[in-house]
Amino acid sequence: MRIAIAGTVIGTTVGITVGRTVRWWRTWGYDPGEAAKALPGDDLVPTPKGIITRGITIDAPPEAVWPWLVQMGYGRAGWYSYDRMDMQGGSAKTIVPGWQTLAIGDVMPVSPDGGFVVKVVEPGRALVLFTDTEVVESQAARAFEPSSDIPAGLAASGTILRQIPEDFAASWAFALEPLDGGRTRLIERFRIRVGSAGATFRVVGPFIGFGVFVMMQRQMVGLRARAVLTAVAPPVPAPIVTESHRPKSNGRAIEPAAQTVVVAG
């Protein structure tokens, strides 16, 4: 009897947990209108077998969000997600001027061996990344090479990369839509096409889809936190001094240092 009761309690708990997880997966950030609308980069994967579209409202204008998008990538500012999975260190908490240049054809790295190819760059509006079988295969072999620079999660992904079918393509779009009150709606869309998938890929496919959502959700929350704080941080007022009282070094007046905004946490 005790075993039966314990089993019932465990089963009920697991069922509730799974139910809540599935509901979170299906509803977080989901808007039917956004899911149906066309976004930049949709044409890169015209016949997807899977689409994930999620949105989040940010209390900051698009120009405050854009710099955080441009500097993303492994070895750069990171992905603002679960860093132990996709970064060697933590994601940046400041806007880095040296990572603010991004052009079509550049690679936004996901590991030391490569990453997504940049396909669309519309400053303040849209960023679209892309990969396909050709890109993945050129990096898959290197993913197996042991390296202290590759987190365990990335190294383990080499097995999955080897199972990518021939007809594979994926696009990852970030769209910024201005809202009233100086706010922004960030919409992310991940589209994937998988051809004649092998047995391994068919098994892990659903888990990959859930994994993409989990990382995306954390990333969007991280982007929101960073953009909001940098947008509302008040400027540091420069001291009012006369020329005769301005601090000097070697006879030259010292100008006030520029402000650096740091995200707490």
Regions found by a protein language model. Name each.
Residues 10, 17-103, 107, 115, ...:
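Hydrophobic ligand-binding cavity/cleft-lining segments
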Residues 1-6:
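Membrane-penetrating hydrophobic segments
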Residues 34-35, 138-217, 223-225:
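Beta-strand/loop substructures that line and gate deep hydrophobic ligand-binding cavities in soluble
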